[in-house]
Amino acid sequence: MIASSLLSNVVPVLKKDDTCAQALGWMDLFRVSHLPVLDGETYMGLLSDEIMYAHGSIHDPIGRLDIPREMTFVYEDAHMYDVIGVASSRLLSVVPVLNRKEVYQGAILLTDILHNIDKLLCIDDPGGIIVLEVNKIDYSLAEVAQIVEYNEAKVLSCYVTCMPDSNKVEITLKVNMVGIGPILDTFIRYRYVIKNTFVSGEEMNEEMRDRYGQLLKFMEM
């Protein structure tokens, strides 16, 4: 899934002679805190409401403001992971997309990113989620997949989180099997720590509920 497939057709663009008041009005209407600024088809940067509030005068044209450009966009062939990385690192509600000739192609809304994460992580597919913990030096994706497949299941998605101030990693797996008991038993035999599990049809435990709450807070930024 690449950036060009995530483009929204509702994100307005700003011109340098638009006023801060006009820009804030568009942001309020579309419930975003950033909008791209163009000079013709040339991308000039990404304007935020914080920049305008700090400037003070909402009647001035946005061309008078210092609008950041670096690390505020992705290219149209960028993978969704790169889009997420830019949005997360800069806390963006909108991610502009350019082609390799630096021509503006459109923008991606944060809500569009989140709506596509379920496809990336196979959230809608039936199965179980297993959260493992293991030493970094012992982590092997091949071994993890082998354990799952030994129990006649398949890994649908996998992501790894390096735990801060620790020599361990957390591995979150989505497998295509609801009855994950045998898989858990095998992981335990291989000395993996089972931190969490979730199976379709079961209620989320407290930790999973907290993580879901954090995701919702991120959506509302």
Region spans (language model):
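Intrinsically disordered, low-complexity terminal regulatory regions
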Residues: 13, 18-28, 34, 206-214, ...
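Short hydrophobic beta-strand motif reused across regulatory alpha/beta modules
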Residues: 33, 45-52, 105-113, 193
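Short acidic/polar active-site loop segments enriched in Thr and Asp
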Residues: 33, 93, 154
